[in-house]
């Protein structure tokens, strides 16, 4: 059985180490034999029994997502618990406690360990049980499977086998990865929703092979058989390489024929498919890898504190053992009751070394309470509750989408309060990813007069005085690189003039543009609307442009039966906007079949339906940056229609296809500067011979099976996508999300650096930067770009690298030499340049420059570059980084950052699934960090410090008493006290601290974002504060022990004249500890709820109740504690007075310190607390404003920085004006004096 499992695992690999395990292939199986590692899977269609052979033994369709099973739970979970240092120590201590050397009863060590570890294991078991029940539910789903002779029956998913023919009906999930054989549609297409795989809600079209179309009924599968040879299991959702051998022919397979497990059949009655991958071989399971393990900085430092406490434990144990050895050697003769004449090995004065070694074990067990056993479980519980509060925060709930914030992991709550740098995607993160068709350029003419939202916002953020400039001859708009370019007014209004007037008017009216009321279409220009384009001089080019919009895509139309209107499911929001625009212009895409698209053209008279035969589709990829379709129109003309990035299209134009290149380039630059997303549109006419030759090459490439198939397809596509004719370009608007500028302003005031990493062109990114206040007028912009060094004799790569390094060095030097303290720099770099800047010999200089800049914008970057920049910022600065994005291309940087935040947007849920926290909109990041991050950081930091304080206070009293009793190894406390201390009596108040503490309210956090800097500066968990709390614990332990020994030792303490025995003294001392540590935590808190009062004071009351009840038990159970409270301690006033004295003495240093700090060196939150408590913000608004203004002193980005810069500019102008007036006044005075003198002389 074991060998089968090993071979099964090896079978999943892309590369086979053992030749004997590779599937055999026969040379007579056809011309397309799959060779090479990674392409060895053979599937016998409709013959699943053939896969039972050893060499083809595939995994079952049973899927398990659990971490444990009945056999592995105990060992694996115990390992998870005891690889923690503290838990391992207590395990060793519990084992040693069963031997006579232990100073405690064994259950006082074993019971707390069982409780803490059992609680953690119970939590793991509960979570895994939920996963198991979900697995059972999924595996028990029923599928319709061919049982032979054309008969189909129901079978559980887990019993499906490779090769089974499955029938899936509408709105059902696919039970495994299937090869589509046929569907209810006559042309063999079906619609699939992949939300469970990649989160995308857009429907995808799948198409079966023409040869399997006849398999459309159950009885047609009676004699069906075929062989699939394809790639091995892999996690790539978007690729599939294979062949189908059927009826003696070989047919190529691609991703359009594969139906993936957990995707859903939509808008299709039924499909038939054959199982290719099952269970953990399916692509969805191959993608279910664990996210990288992340630990917060506080948790990492906590490990070092644990090690410090271990060092303290070893130190006091060593001292105790050494003292015991000395006492044994020097004083054993005086202790007659120990029978020194018959010494035991432990008390033999002739062998003190042996006594030292044996006592060392006793001491290590005795002082083990220095290590907080309940620390880990308490922190886990607190973090879960904190995450619940984040999830339930209504201020981060998006009512439009019904999406709340979600803490997908609770391990990083406190890390939210220590973020230094935010790395953000642009599209869908800062912007909405809801595209509106706004402008276009056709045949060298720009159409569309409506101003973009970015133009309006950028104009506003750059503080353009429109009132002054409307009367001038030149009107300014924000342009590339922060310069102000002008447009001269022309006698006849051009589109640019109309556009400028729109900007001015809209800005005056509050930046509110009117909407067309059509989602995806904000275009406004009567020259193209209502068929008016027929009157334009280049109407033929406009016709081709609009047909490209309507035909060149892979979208799916859905017609509403009630209204008759079409909606579209497309792979990107851009395509939907194009189709909506085409429909508004009179070219409505109405129907798609496997081989054709149908367009209803109504530009002249009655609507005419035209059919375009789709011959080939050259899909869009991030590498190609373009897509093309080859169609045959109704006249038989073959056309290649292509759209893509302008840089890609322009280099593929023919000589006679560049007629509009210059004008279109100019328009594209303007669109980019207006923050619009642009694409160039082109076409090419093909003749039959040329197409036939190319199509045969394309078929060969598509039929090939191997690692180089994509490369071959790209090469063949390049052969066709050339000699293009440029028609025009599109410009769609991706609007800023609600509240983005305000959020960025708050984050900037909180001291956070913001870097934008986007795949858009530089002009678009820059203007988005202006719109959201990452850039502003007067900010010095540094551009790092590749420059051609003409005449250079050295290697081009080396020359480029050297040139970029020099640019970085010069820019860094310029920043250092800058004397203006208010100067702000922005770094802008593109993807090509970034490739060199991220190399090992340059990247740290680049990082140093980026850190010195107020904002960083990286344009045209790939997903891999996003991850590399994030890693550089994280590892290079050593500070906490947060990455935020919404698409699959952001997954790398989200997983690479210390904290990953996913936005549940239009692009799907892949970013969310890879993230640590998810929110619906970027603006919620403000509250997530400034409020919850600040609170969680401070709560966890104070909680951990207090944990160490209380355990040092308790543990060192054991050491003092042992020293007081001659290092005898005797514990002063009853074993039951030890059992309760960490687990019950002091754990609940500290949990209340970690869950409910607030230094200031959420409103004040947002009003005073500079408070957030306490986290990145680590003010509450630096070594000074940690050592301070430990020192406070040492002081409290000394005070408690000294006062109790001084009061209760060798003197009567009650009216009956009795002296206190060890148990009475231990009980009194333990009572003082309970009071001291609980009063200390009450003084630590700034915010109280009734829950905190109940838990703090209830813990003290619980101690007295326990003492009373335990003392009522028979002496056989309670031992020396029998009636301890009721008869011994409670009647003695000194017992109660000692508790009050200890409370006053132990809290005195903390009160003195906090009073000194608040009076002479207050922290920001101290000032805010006093202002709010005494309502000074209401009585003295100027002081409140002044305190809030501290947040903006170092802010160089955001709306606030822009306003401050404007104020400084106006003050400078005013000072210069006064200076000029003073000089003019002085000159006029001198002139008047001169005139008087000359007049006198003349007289």
Curated annotation (Swiss-Prot):
Extracellular side: 97-100, 328-359, 962-975, 1049-1061, 1112-1128
Pfam families: Cation_ATPase (PF13246), PhoLip_ATPase_C (PF16212), PhoLip_ATPase_N (PF16209)
Keyword list, A-Z: ATP-binding, Cell membrane, Isopeptide bond, Magnesium, Membrane, Metal-binding, Nucleotide-binding, Translocase, Transmembrane, Transmembrane helix, Ubl conjugation
GO terms for MF: ATP binding; ATP hydrolysis activity; ATPase-coupled intramembrane lipid transporter activity; magnesium ion binding
Keyword hit for RNA-binding: no
Primary subcellular site in the record, as a coarse category: membrane
Catalysed reactions listed for this entry: ATP + H2O + phospholipidSide 1 = ADP + phosphate + phospholipidSide 2
Protein's job: Involved in transport of phospholipids and in regulation of pollen plasma membrane lipid asymmetry.
NCBIfam families in the cross-refs: ATPase-Plipid, ATPase_P-type
Annotated protein name in UniProt: Probable phospholipid-transporting ATPase 7
Organism: Arabidopsis thaliana (Mouse-ear cress)
Gene name tied to this protein: ALA7
